[in-house]
Amino acid sequence: MIVKYGGNAMKSVELRRAVAGEIAALRAEQPVVVVHGGGPVIERELAARGIASEFSNGLRVTSPQAMAVVEMALAQLNKQLSQDIGAAVGLLGRDSELLVAEVLDPALGRVGRVTRVNAGLLRTLLGVGLTPVVGCVAVGPDGDALNVNADTAAGAVAGALGEGIVFLTDVDGIYRAYPDPESLASQLPRAEVEAGIRDGWIAGGMIPKVRAALEALDAGAPFAVIASGMQPGVLAAAARGEAGTRLTP
């Protein structure tokens, strides 16, 4: 199974370690690959160096200077997560061309879209009982680093491996009328997801998550769930279909 982890769910050290413990427990039942972003950490490191953050359609505009900081921040976070999980191998997507990407839009700078996943490397690590922990820096056509969206990268990994994926975020799932708890959807077919985007009840940062989830399903992932990473015990429940919102083709 693929676990996409990032955002507010990793702001607290205590919460990060709790999620790491859940990942370690889940690993006893099935192989797990962790794909992570690092928005809050990247923001902090950029601000400390006086580099302004700029976004376009939810994607970070990434200059070569900012890319160096992004890669450094993700490498540090990757090491921390790997240590928290235990029996894990921390990798950035550039390592062994694990994630290969093309430039998404020259106007965004060093921002890419994953075009190939080194699934063989991941299967080799899983085969010897290790948990790959993947930070979202890909290798571009020129061999240099590209910043890739963690949601879409995780979806690409799920599709390449043909495994289910759980996106951990800071809400319990997808709401038809947020924050009404009664409107939390336990399951959404593609047609209703598209309607939700069109009608505005799926918006903002949730859009790339649902797009990535649908792309993962199209590529062969058997399931995709969006669930909260802010509460203990959710990960295993989401994997069983008992928490979050499960997207279906």
Swiss-Prot record:
It is found in: Cytoplasm. It is an enzyme of class 2 (transferase). Signal peptide: none annotated. SUPFAM superfamilies: Carbamate kinase-like. It catalyses: N-acetyl-L-glutamate + ATP = N-acetyl-L-glutamyl 5-phosphate + ADP. One of its GO terms (molecular function) is acetylglutamate kinase activity. One of its GO terms (biological process) is L-arginine biosynthetic process. Pathway: Amino-acid biosynthesis; L-arginine biosynthesis; N(2)-acetyl-L-ornithine from L-glutamate: step 2/4. The record marks K4, K209 as: Transition state stabilizer. Catalyzes the ATP-dependent phosphorylation of N-acetyl-L-glutamate. HAMAP family: ArgB. This is Acetylglutamate kinase. It comes from Deinococcus geothermalis (strain DSM 11300 / CIP 105573 / AG-3a).
